[in-house]
Amino acid sequence: LDSIQQKRKEIWNMYYQNLQGISSLSLPVLPDYATNNAHAFYAVCATPEERTALIRYLKSHGVYSVFHYLSLHKSDFVKNQKWEVEELPQADKYTDCLVRFPLFYALEPDEVKYICEQIKSFYTSERDEASFGER
């Protein structure tokens, strides 16, 4: 179990180190008081359109990234209750803009490098920025 956890942390750190220079992506913040269990690696895109374009771009290059979750206040369960639910714009921002990248034990360093190269390529290649909205 320790070796599995250690490898996941190494993969997480590879992502973090390789993606730090992309100003359009917000990377995870690990407070000084916390520890990293490396269960997932994610980034937050500037807009929902950007996230959709990034996921589509990565898929076209053989990388399967996914969105993370639906805000609980917008889930069918909550919608079907008689509760008065307020708007939660920060939760919605993460629902709409967060993307998770592959992170599993069998992932090899050269694969992580390739994924990071594709993410960088998305942000550095010439593309029609209108295709994913305003920054």
Regions found by a protein language model. Give the residues of each.
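PLP-dependent aminotransferase class I/II
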Residues: 1-135
